[in-house]
């Protein structure tokens, strides 16, 4: 089926006399449907798709209800949806199943190609969930009568079109920026700020409330493009048809303008200038370990995607800890170094997956696996450690942090560096997610080929690093500077043990890992060419839901609702209750609530680990098939 202006119909359609002329949009829609159907056949990917879709659907229904009850709150939530459409693809790597580079040989103009790609982008879970969310505009229009409802339906459709086109433009602009080092740093900083704002939104809300700016915020959310549909529905309800029609026309014009801009950006992806080759200074290092470390440092400095993610981690740490300055609180500022290390571990958690099939070099070279893994850890420590130390020391001096806080900072930094080095190595081997090989990436540098599994791996890495850092903080709370010693010991122990686990897995299942990175899936049992070993742990959708759900709930109950309130209560009368349940109940019930939360969290953790270990035990000893061409 050709993707040209007048495609040739299949032979059986021509004989039947049917109109076999199928346009490019219809073909790409079918391709997207086929890709989605194929993804749902994979148990692992299907679980993440349905899990994310279910959570998104709940949020979308909440947005519809909020728009119907409180339009001000609904406008703020619609703004959050637009922010999510802008930031989400940047974090996940563009999320382009069909890329413009794939259709260069079809002869389609950039306008027709852009229209076909945009049309096909409505196929998926995220657009459907977003379509439910923008029904909040219709919920507001229903109160104004039949005509207002009809106009609200048009406004909701235009609002959805704006979400799709603005998201594409954001990915396209950042994709252009990350082709240059300065642009990659700028794009990473903007993404870090965009993600830090929701994380520390309480500071922004408190600052606005202190200045009595809630009404100004309500006006601003309606003035933003995300609120134009809601403003049109409200105007139609009160009979201001000129304003209502004008808002809808503005939405349509914005959708058309962003679509045109995206088509212009597509031109740069389908045509490319020749690259200039400049001689590079030769590496000089003593021994294979030093040479490998320097090679990884150089490749990281030249990889624009890695530069972008490193800048994101640094910007997130700075903005996350600096936003409380809006309410005059400097207490979080010195923690920017530790937060930066945690975020850097997140973006470092899929090293082998991002390098792709280059793993075969380590598999066929005797002794190279150990050297390469240790060099990757050394690269992480050299790239993050000195910068985190300078950042922490500088912000301690700038904020005038009291000396009583220094043991906590030292403990957190030491433990986070060691745990980050160990966890990133283990996750890169045990939970590798295949992506597009670097030499096969297209014009969109962000489109690395990852999916929701890579996002889940990054968040699991963050939870593990934070969890392994907490014991050192507890020791610092109880014994002062001994917490720093505990942090060094904890970090070193975690790094040593997790490195051993990763090396053992590489030795035993390195071929299976290469198969995963090459073919996008692990080998299935019973196929020809099986080799002795352990079958990869495969969980059913129900088991995945239990393991993941128990792990997430256990994390929420054990740390935010258990350990953190206990530390606050131990320090005296809490002044900030935030969302800690134990701080909102009467004083007599505070410690019992903490005990219940810690018990429930630990129990859920045990359930999650037990279910996973049971599946791992069942997989142990089963033959692992490897394709003959692996």
What is each stretch, according to the model?
Residues 360-366:
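Catalytic phosphate/nucleotide-handling subdomain of diverse soluble enzymes
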Residues 2-100, 109-358, 369-630:
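Hydrophobic alpha-helical transmembrane segments of membrane proteins
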Residues 103-105:
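Helix-capping/transition residues at the boundaries of transmembrane alpha-helices
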């Amino acid at each position: 089926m050709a993707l040209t202006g007048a495609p040739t119909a299949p032979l059986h359609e021509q004989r039947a006399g049917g109109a076999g002329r199928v346009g490019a949009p219809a073909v790409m829609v079918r391709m997207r449907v086929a890709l989605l159907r194929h993804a749902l056949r994979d148990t692992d990917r299907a679980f993440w798709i349905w899990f994310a879709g279910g959570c998104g659907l709940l949020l979308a229904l909440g947005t519809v209800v909020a728009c119907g009850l409180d339009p001000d709150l609904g406008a703020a939530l619609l703004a959050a949806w637009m922010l999510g459409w802008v930031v989400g693809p940047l974090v996940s790597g563009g999320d382009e199943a069909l890329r413009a580079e794939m259709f260069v040989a079809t002869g389609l103009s950039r306008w027709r190609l852009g229209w076909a790609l945009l049309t096909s982008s409505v196929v998926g879970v995220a657009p459907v969930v977003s379509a439910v969310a923008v029904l909040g505009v219709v919920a507001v229009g229903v109160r104004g009568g039949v005509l207002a409802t009809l106009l609200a339906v048009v406004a909701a459709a235009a609002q959805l079109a704006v979400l799709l086109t603005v998201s594409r433009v954001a990915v396209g602009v950042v994709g252009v920026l990350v082709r240059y080092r300065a642009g990659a740093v700028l794009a990473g900083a903007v993404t870090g700020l965009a993600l830090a704002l929701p994380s520390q939104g309480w500071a922004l809300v408190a600052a606005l409330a202190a200045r009595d700016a809630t009404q100004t915020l309500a006006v601003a959310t309606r003035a933003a493009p995300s609120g134009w549909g809601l403003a049109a529905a409200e105007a139609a309800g009160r009979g201001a048809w000129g304003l209502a029609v004008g808002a809808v026309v503005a939405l349509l014009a914005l959708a058309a303008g962003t679509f045109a801009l995206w088509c212009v950006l597509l031109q740069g992806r389908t045509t490319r200038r020749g690259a200039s080759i400049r001689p590079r200074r030769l590496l000089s290092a003593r021994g294979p370990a030093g040479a490998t470390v320097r090679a990884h440092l150089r490749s990281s400095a030249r990889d624009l995607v890695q530069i972008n993610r490193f800048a994101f981690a640094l910007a997130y740490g700075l903005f996350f800890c600096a936003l409380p300055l809006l309410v005059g609180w400097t207490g979080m500022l010195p923690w920017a170094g530790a937060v930066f290390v945690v975020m850097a571990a997140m973006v470092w958690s899929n090293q082998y997956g991002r390098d792709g099939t280059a793993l075969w070099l380590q598999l066929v070279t005797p002794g190279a696996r150990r050297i390469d893994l240790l060099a990757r850890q050394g690269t992480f420590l050299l790239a993050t450690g000195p910068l985190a130390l300078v950042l922490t020391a500088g912000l301690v001096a700038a904020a005038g942090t009291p000396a009583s806080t220094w043991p906590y900072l030292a403990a957190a930094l030491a433990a986070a560096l060691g745990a980050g080095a160990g966890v990133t190595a283990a996750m890169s081997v045990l939970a590798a997610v295949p992506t597009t090989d670097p030499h096969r990436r297209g014009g969109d540098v962000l489109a690395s080929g990852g999916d929701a599994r890579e996002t889940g791996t990054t968040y699991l890495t963050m939870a593990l690093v934070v969890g392994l850092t907490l014991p050192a903080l507890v020791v610092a709370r109880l014994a002062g500077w001994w917490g720093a010693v505990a942090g060094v010991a904890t970090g070193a122990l975690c790094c040593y043990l997790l490195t051993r686990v990763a090396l053992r897995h590489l030795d035993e299942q390195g071929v299976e890992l290469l198969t995963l990175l090459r073919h996008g899936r692990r080998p299935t049992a019973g196929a020809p060419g099986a080799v002795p070993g352990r079958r990869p742990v495969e969980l059913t959708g129900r088991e995945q839901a239990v393991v993941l759900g128990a792990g997430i709930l256990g994390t929420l109950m054990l740390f935010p609702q258990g350990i953190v309130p206990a530390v606050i209560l131990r320090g005296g009368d809490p002044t900030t209750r935030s969302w800690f349940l134990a701080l909102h109940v009467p004083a007599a019930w505070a410690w019992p609530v903490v005990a219940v939360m810690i018990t429930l969290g630990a129990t859920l953790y045990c359930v999650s680990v037990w279910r996973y270990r049971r599946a791992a035990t069942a997989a142990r000893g089963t033959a692992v098939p490897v394709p003959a061409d692996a």
